[in-house]
């Protein structure tokens, strides 16, 4: 077969544009492509909910790729092993209660699990605001290309509609911080966006399932963003809580929308 460059270009533009347009109206929009949101996306999509992840960077996976200090291994507790099993991620016991997995394999299979279930992922998309309606309830997101932000270009964004939004942007809790800053009187949780405490893995992991919840009408938090909003400690390269948080936020949303 003789290849034609323009046909290649048209195939990419047309096929992506169809999907991008289709996902301007979704059930669940997850902001941030870290492990918690990847896990959530799989379960949400399997439940038949139209699910999309927007990732600001080129690669999804958040901080999981590099393990701890660029040693590509992560630790997972026994409580979360069933999630590794469901995604087909291999692991072994290091010592009692501590299980080790390859961080690169883990991210690859989390991505595969989410997309194979039917979730869509758009990378290099920056979520710069939320869309609101009556009573300042969130009804979608305001998006632009990450390149626009990096280049400091004056380019108006576009908007997508979503029944619920999940802030899975990690330490900065970008969506929650935006809502608190831009919606007069908005209070996320009891104290607003507090910011994470210093590292205390045991406490941070235990608190994560309590902090994973709806914090503002139609806005949920998962993963490190949940602890950042609540003022709970950071956990470091132990990922059991992240995985469980993703599953929990999916279950909360499925119970509501499913």
UniProtKB/Swiss-Prot annotation:
<feature type="binding site">
    <location>
        <position position="234"/>
    </location>
    <ligand>
        <name>glycine</name>
    </ligand>
</feature>
<dbReference type="InterPro" id="IPR036188">
    <property type="entry name" value="FAD/NAD-bd_sf"/>
</dbReference>
<dbReference type="GO" id="GO:0005506">
    <property type="term" value="F:iron ion binding"/>
</dbReference>
<feature type="binding site" description="in other chain">
    <location>
        <position position="36"/>
    </location>
    <ligand>
        <name>NAD(+)</name>
    </ligand>
</feature>
<comment type="pathway">
    <text>Cofactor biosynthesis; thiamine diphosphate biosynthesis.</text>
</comment>
<dbReference type="Pfam" id="PF01946">
    <property type="entry name" value="Thi4"/>
</dbReference>
<dbReference type="InterPro" id="IPR002922">
    <property type="entry name" value="Thi4_fam"/>
</dbReference>
<feature type="binding site" description="in other chain">
    <location>
        <position position="127"/>
    </location>
    <ligand>
        <name>NAD(+)</name>
    </ligand>
</feature>
<keyword id="KW-0479">Metal-binding</keyword>
<dbReference type="GO" id="GO:0009229">
    <property type="term" value="P:thiamine diphosphate biosynthetic process"/>
</dbReference>
<comment type="similarity">
    <text>Belongs to the THI4 family.</text>
</comment>
<keyword id="KW-0408">Iron</keyword>
<keyword id="KW-0784">Thiamine biosynthesis</keyword>
<feature type="binding site" description="in other chain">
    <location>
        <position position="63"/>
    </location>
    <ligand>
        <name>NAD(+)</name>
    </ligand>
</feature>
<feature type="binding site" description="in other chain">
    <location>
        <begin position="55"/>
        <end position="56"/>
    </location>
    <ligand>
        <name>NAD(+)</name>
    </ligand>
</feature>
<feature type="binding site">
    <location>
        <position position="156"/>
    </location>
    <ligand>
        <name>Fe cation</name>
    </ligand>
</feature>
<comment type="function">
    <text>Involved in the biosynthesis of the thiazole moiety of thiamine. Catalyzes the conversion of NAD and glycine to adenosine diphosphate 5-(2-hydroxyethyl)-4-methylthiazole-2-carboxylate (ADT), an adenylated thiazole intermediate, using free sulfide as a source of sulfur.</text>
</comment>
<comment type="subunit">
    <text>Homooctamer; tetramer of dimers.</text>
</comment>
<dbReference type="GO" id="GO:0009228">
    <property type="term" value="P:thiamine biosynthetic process"/>
</dbReference>
<keyword id="KW-0808">Transferase</keyword>
<feature type="binding site" description="in other chain">
    <location>
        <position position="224"/>
    </location>
    <ligand>
        <name>NAD(+)</name>
    </ligand>
</feature>
<feature type="binding site">
    <location>
        <begin position="154"/>
        <end position="156"/>
    </location>
    <ligand>
        <name>NAD(+)</name>
    </ligand>
</feature>
<dbReference type="GO" id="GO:0016763">
    <property type="term" value="F:pentosyltransferase activity"/>
</dbReference>
<dbReference type="InterPro" id="IPR022828">
    <property type="entry name" value="Thi4_prok"/>
</dbReference>
<protein>
    <recommendedName>
        <fullName>Thiamine thiazole synthase</fullName>
        <ecNumber>2.4.2.59</ecNumber>
    </recommendedName>
</protein>
<dbReference type="GO" id="GO:0052837">
    <property type="term" value="P:thiazole biosynthetic process"/>
</dbReference>
<keyword id="KW-0520">NAD</keyword>
<feature type="binding site" description="in other chain">
    <location>
        <position position="171"/>
    </location>
    <ligand>
        <name>Fe cation</name>
    </ligand>
</feature>
């Amino acid at each position: 077969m003789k290849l034609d460059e323009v046909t290649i270009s048209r195939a990419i533009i047309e096929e992506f544009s169809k999907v991008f347009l289709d996902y301007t109206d979704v059930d669940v929009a997850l902001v941030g492509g870290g492990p918690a949101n990847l896990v959530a996306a799989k379960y949400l999509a399997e439940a038949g909910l139209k699910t999309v992840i927007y990732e600001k960077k080129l690669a999804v996976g958040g901080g999981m790729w590099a393990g701890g200090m660029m040693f590509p291994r992560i630790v997972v507790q026994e409580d979360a092993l069933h999630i590794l099993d469901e995604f087909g991620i291999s692991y072994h016991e290091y010592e009692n209660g501590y299980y080790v997995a390859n961080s690169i394999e883990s991210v690859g299979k989390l991505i595969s699990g989410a997309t194979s279930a039917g979730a869509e992922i758009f990378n290099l998309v920056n979520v710069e605001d939320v869309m609101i309606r009556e009573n300042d309830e969130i009804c979608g997101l305001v998006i632009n290309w990450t390149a626009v932000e990096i280049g400091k270009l004056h380019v108006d964004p576009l908007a997508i509609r979503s029944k619920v939004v999940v802030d899975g942007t990690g330490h900065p809790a970008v969506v929650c911080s935006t809502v608190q800053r831009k919606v007069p009187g908005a209070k996320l949780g009891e104290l607003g966006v507090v910011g994470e405490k210093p590292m205390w893995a045991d406490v941070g992991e235990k608190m994560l399932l309590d902090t994973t919840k709806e914090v503002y009408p139609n806005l949920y938090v998962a993963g490190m963003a949940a602890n950042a909003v609540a003022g709970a400690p950071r956990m470091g390269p132990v990922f059991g809580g992240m995985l469980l948080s993703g599953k929990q936020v999916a279950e909360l949303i499925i119970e509501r929308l499913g």
